[in-house]
Structure formats: C-alpha cells, structure tokens
Amino acid sequence: RRQRQMCIRDSVQVENPDFTLYSDTLHYDTESKVATILGPSVIVSDSGTIHTSRGWYDTVNNTSLLLDQSQVESGEKILIGDSIFYNRDTGMGEVYGNMSLIDTAQHVTLQGEYGYYNEQTGYAFATDSARFLEYSQGDTLFLHADTLQMVTVDSVYREIKAYYGVRFYRIDMQGVCDSMQFNTRDSVLYMYTEPVLWNEQYQLYGDTIAIYMNDSTIEYAHVIQFAFAAQHVDSSYYNQLKGNDLKAYFEGQAVHQIDVAGNAESIFYPLEKDGAKVGMNETKSGFLTIWVKDNKLDKLKIW
C-alpha cells in the first residue's frame, strides 16, 4: 500500500503554482495535500509571506492553522497571534491569543486577545483587552476599550472606532468615554456618551467632545452641548465654566484660551502673587472668553 505520510527534513522546499513553502521540518500527506509544519518555515506567495514554526497548511484549499506567534505579512501589514486561522484566498485571518495587527506605513498597531483581519477590505476587529497605538507623530496615543474596529478608508487613511469602557492617554491629554471615533484623514478624535477630557489642571465634560489635532499637538477641543470645564486651584476649590458650547484652544501642551457660547457662566477664585485666594468672582452672560497664562486666569471677557 502506498504510504500517505512523508516526513521531510532539512532545507525543505515545496513548489506550488500559487506559493512556495520553505521549511526545516514538515510532514506531508500526499492524499489530503496537507503539510504539517514542525519547524521554522516560510510560505511565500503573491499575496504575502507567512512566517511560522508550527501548524498546518492545506495546499488545495489554501487554508492554514498557524501556532506559536506566527506572522502573516501582507503588503505593509503584519498579523501576529498565538493561533491564526488563515485563508489565503479570502485574505481572512482570525486570531486567538495575543493578537497584533501592525500597519508599518501608518504607524498604528491594533491588539487584543481575540480578533480578525480581512486583507481584501482592510477591516480589522479586536476585543478582550483591546488596545490601539498610534505613533505616527512625536507622541504615542494609547487607546484601550472593550471592542476596537479599524476601517480602511483608502490606501492612506484609517478610521478607528472604540466601544465600551474607552480610555486613552497621550502625554498632553487623557480621557474616558463610552465610545470614540478617530479618523486619520482629518485627525479629529470624537468622544461620545459622558466623555471627560483631562489636560494638566483642566477637566472638560459635555455631551460630545471633538478633539482637533494638528500634527503631534492638540489644536483645540470642542465640547458640544452641556459643556463644563473645571480648573484645579487647590484641594477644595475649582475655577469653573459652563455653557451650551465650549472650545478650549491649546498652545504647546497647555490650554491658553477658552470660548463659551450660550448661557455662559463662570466661577473664579482670584489669587494674589503669593497664591493666596482673594474671594470669588461669578459671572453670567451670553458669551464668555478667558485667556490663560502659566495655568492662571490672565483675562476674562463677557458679552
């Protein structure tokens, strides 16, 4: 009877019209055409390259199970995971355990304990300790949520959507909200459902917050509806602003101007040069602007 299993060792090369498999050690089933990979291996095709040391590859259906932090490279993206179910024909990779999707062109990384990526559509999904890192500029944006999605808008731009328990951090800001959306095309980060944004001594809160970024710095934060801002004075006192709409403008990494439009109210605790408080000032107006210098109120205009 013809032997089905072939055990091949040392500088193995399997040629196929669609790919070439290089391996240290593999078992090959001549009937099912399935190659069981037992050593460092590389599978090269027009669609990309696979690096693995353990798993199997169905040479008929172009499907595979890749184990032990294997890598699937397609263009400028690298998919890594403990266990990857990969279909080369559909471009779909499903990952269980320590998933990472690295976009080397856009300088972003999507991570989670479970997720999948479609090479053909550019859609990626991650959940269970899901994380997103954006490091195209000087400061890295760290984002965590229950569920993350990355949508490829075109060859250049990406759209990131985060759901449930969203937390993010960058050297000049940090925030929490229930859901969030970030578009690399216009560099605007949208925070929805009880969003809170912190910057140095300031805390911003409202119905929705849109953060407009220019290169590696924040240009301004737009708090839409039920806008509120608080600045920490000491353990018992906070300067406060509220209104229908609020825009906080940044210079460097700090707030330098805040505009409030519609039912504008303010409470401020003026300080002497030695830091002593000298009472409380309260205003109500249609519109309000404050200018900040060295994290202290410099000027206030109401109208």
Where are the predicted features?
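Feature marks extracellular polysaccharide-active and adherence modules
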Residues: 15, 29, 38, 58, ...
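Residues at the loop-to-beta-strand transition
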Residues: 12, 18, 32, 41, ...
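Transmembrane beta-strand segments that form the barrel wall of outer-membrane beta-barrel proteins
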Residues: 9-13, 37-43, 65-71, 96-101, ...
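Solvent-exposed loop/turn segments connecting transmembrane beta-strands
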Residues: 16-19, 45-49, 74-78, 104-107, ...
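Exposed, low-structure sequence patches enriched in small/polar residues
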Residues: 167-168, 174, 196-208, 225-248, ...
